[in-house]
Swiss-Prot record:
GO terms for cellular component: chloroplast thylakoid membrane; proton-transporting ATP synthase complex. The chain crosses the membrane at residues 35-55. It is a single-pass membrane protein. Keywords: ATP synthesis, CF(0), Chloroplast, Hydrogen ion transport, Ion transport, Membrane, Plastid, Thylakoid, Transmembrane, Transmembrane helix, Transport. In plastids the F-type ATPase is also known as CF(1)CF(0). F(1)F(0) ATP synthase produces ATP from ADP in the presence of a proton or sodium gradient. F-type ATPases consist of two structural domains, F(1) containing the extramembraneous catalytic core and F(0) containing the membrane proton channel, linked together by a central stalk and a peripheral stalk. During catalysis, ATP synthesis in the catalytic domain of F(1) is coupled via a rotary mechanism of the central stalk subunits to proton translocation. Component of the F(0) channel, it forms part of the peripheral stalk, linking F(1) to F(0). It is found in: Plastid, Chloroplast thylakoid membrane. Pfam families: ATP-synt_B (PF00430). This is ATP synthase subunit b, chloroplastic.
Length: 190
């Protein structure tokens, strides 16, 4: 087949009629001799080959290649659509997870914020209690110190008064009075 078409095509590249003498290469303006030579060459090289069969086979092959290409394209298109749907599904899933993480994150942040605020309030309350306890302790200590100081001063004042007022006669009278009290107590018990 290739030889026949190559031979036929090569005839179109031969020099024009004037160069070979009797052989005219212009197929459209040829005479009967040239046509018979061309037909002879075609018949000789194309034995057992039907031109319409060759053309039909060529067209069938071309049709099959086109159909195969279309089929492959449809398969690729179907695969691409399937992958696109899978990607869209994954995208929706990831978007939902992102929204859920965002919502959970916000609620977690709010929960942590509330926990922190509560913890700070508790700490402040404890500090306030410690402050009040410290103030009460210091007040009580100060009151005790003042009492002790007042008691010491009163005791010193009383001792000073006693020492200035005491003499031997007062001592003897106090001792006699105490002995009398003890004696009367002893009589009552007997």
């Amino acid at each position: 087949m290739k030889n026949v078409t190559d031979s036929f095509l090569s005839l179109g590249h031969w020099p024009f009629a004037g160069s070979f003498g009797f052989f005219n290469t212009d197929i459209l303006s040829t005479n009967l001799i040239n046509l018979s030579v061309v037909l002879g060459v075609l018949i000789f090289f194309g034995k057992g080959v039907c031109a319409s069969c060759l053309l039909s086979d060529l067209l069938d092959n071309r049709k099959q290649r086109i159909l195969n290409t279309i089929r492959n394209s449809e398969e690729l298109r179907g695969g691409a659509i399937e992958q696109l749907e899978k990607a869209r599904t994954r995208l929706r899933k990831v978007e939902m997870e992102a929204d859920q993480f965002r919502v959970n994150g916000y609620s977690e942040i709010e929960r942590e914020k509330l926990n922190l605020i509560n913890s700070i309030y508790k700490t402040l309350e404890q500090l306030e209690n410690y402050k009040n306890e410290t103030i009460q302790f210091e007040q009580q200590r100060t009151i005790n110190q003042v009492r002790q100081r007042v008691f010491q001063q009163a005791l010193q004042g009383a001792l000073g008064t006693l020492n200035s007022c005491l003499n031997n006669e007062l001592h003897l009278r106090t001792i006699s009075a105490n002995i009398g009290i003890l004696g009367s107590i002893k009589e009552k018990t007997d």
